[in-house]
């Protein structure tokens, strides 16, 4: 009996030993789960939940193996394996994968598959087709399960958030996403530039889709630029992510091709040729390369269009950089001919052509001067010549600049004024002031420019000015108010002047007062005096900013001028764009009245009248633009900053010999390239101002680099007709932009033409701005503002004028009102 039991004991022991020593079974190739499984059980588990997997077993199972993604599953502090069951505590997204339970028995092996996804994210990351109703609903997550543990917020798809800078064209839709999760379900809020972002902070608002952790902004505009931060938080933590948005303005032009490209080529037979075509365009251009060919001996077809062969066209994955270059390999005589780069967009087409000439290959001849000795001699001679030229140029420049230097104490305060006012220290004045007034040099009376209550200007010594009874206003009759702005050396404040009109000594008038800043220099003081004296000399006119008075005695210099309550013309027009098409930076602002065509023509007419008067006084403005035209409470146009112009009483042009900061988008070619300023160059600027008026404050040639603008002007490029401008007015602009200055109209002729057009234009002829101005006209305002006389627009030459003063503009104070003919 005991022998039988002993034998049975040893049999069981041997069997158990063999089973234990058997190596872990591997899946047969045909049963590998990484092929196409027959049956897979899918499980979605939330982070922090308990993951339980149970394998179905047969009665005769001898061994069980667990694998995840083809790798043996091992136990850990969170993972427990008990035969046919696997438990994973506090599951995390890294626990996701394809689990396999492999069982072995005498009858064969069997595999059970489990597809596990540990995530709170939705099955699809896209929400393009989500209902808009989801924008007001919080993301619903089952956080009430008893086995859920608290989890701080975390990103569920960080790889989709790697792109932080998003540059998009205006009018596009922008969507930012911050897919995340946590327990309990976290909240989502958005900041713009570090401050709370609310729907009423932008025109059109925005949508937040909590189900997909996203924010959507339709029809973005330049004011939407900034940093957008999503903050995801619950009681156990907080995370944030910042996106940067840059909105690019659209250029209302057909493609612009760089001058001189493609260039003509002359090559030898068998050479390689490369044609280059540089294209500037927004919207996206379509580029093609064509070769002109002959058909039956003719280059022109029956439709009067040239025969051509398409050599290269843009594909789905072809970039603009690739399309801008045409490569020809191993050219033959048949390759000679005319090649054209054709670029088009939704606005129009542009093309440039070049010729390829193929010559016989030249026989190589031994070079005569290729030895190192000859090359060394050439290099030394060339270097010596260049150095000599540089030294000579410096010497000549020094000699010329030395002869042109003038002492500050004797410089004139205005340009060739009838009476000059030199600034002097400690001057002696004759007892008979009238004698000195008639002597041709007006001496300065002892009167400090700094009062006892105001510190002396940092860069200005103690100077004295004469009192002019015609313009002098006692300081106690001037009440200074709030600042209106400041510029390069001065500032402007709103003030109330009492008794400007001698006949009404108690009448209070709102005025603007120009004064120096505390860090002004002697040069700045001279410029302010120069402007004041120029305004005295020019006199008064309804359509210019007039001098009203000055405070020159016993304190700082105050220059009192007319106050224009509605700001400059550019901002005035932008504020009155029709609803839905303007891009106003004040979301609460809505225009109350739409401008008519007659209003716009009246603007141009009044500016032309003001310029006609300045021209009659032999003054050249040099910086005529909508930003330098101010609008009064009664909608009267007044030209500003003409006091900075040069007097040309004895010569009919003004040539600037030193480089400076120039408003190149408004400048005539002769002023831009030769620094020659005339009344005709002001007429060119008036043409650009007309274009600004009929685009309601648009920015000329936006986004065009300075060097490209130079080339475009030399090639005869002119801006296109605004959408709501008549052909007659556009032809007036083109006449103002004539390349030959003498062929441009005079301001007198412009006044006569505009007077006639105003009379013929109906008051009810309102602008139809329902056309797509966001693509075809500059209805996007230039966000940059000007504080200097030359302005701060997108195309400028960036060296400051050494002798051009720079006073601030009046800030815009928007008010509605139609324009009447003045």
From Swiss-Prot:
Active site: 623
Binding residue positions for ATP: 484-490, 514, 562-564, 568, 627, 641
Gene Ontology CC entries for this record: cytoplasmic vesicle; cytosol; glutamatergic synapse; nucleus; perinuclear region of cytoplasm; plasma membrane; postsynapse; receptor complex
Positions where Phosphotyrosine occurs in the chain: 463, 583, 585, 653-654, 730, 766
Domain (Protein kinase): residue spans on this chain: 478-767
Post-translational modification: Autophosphorylated. Binding of FGF family members together with heparan sulfate proteoglycan or heparin promotes receptor dimerization and autophosphorylation on tyrosine residues. Autophosphorylation occurs in trans between the two FGFR molecules present in the dimer and proceeds in a highly ordered manner. Initial autophosphorylation at Tyr-653 increases the kinase activity by a factor of 50 to 100. After this, Tyr-583 becomes phosphorylated, followed by phosphorylation of Tyr-463, Tyr-766, Tyr-583 and Tyr-585.
Regulation (activators, inhibitors): Present in an inactive conformation in the absence of bound ligand. Ligand binding leads to dimerization and activation by sequential autophosphorylation on tyrosine residues.
Protein name: Fibroblast growth factor receptor 1
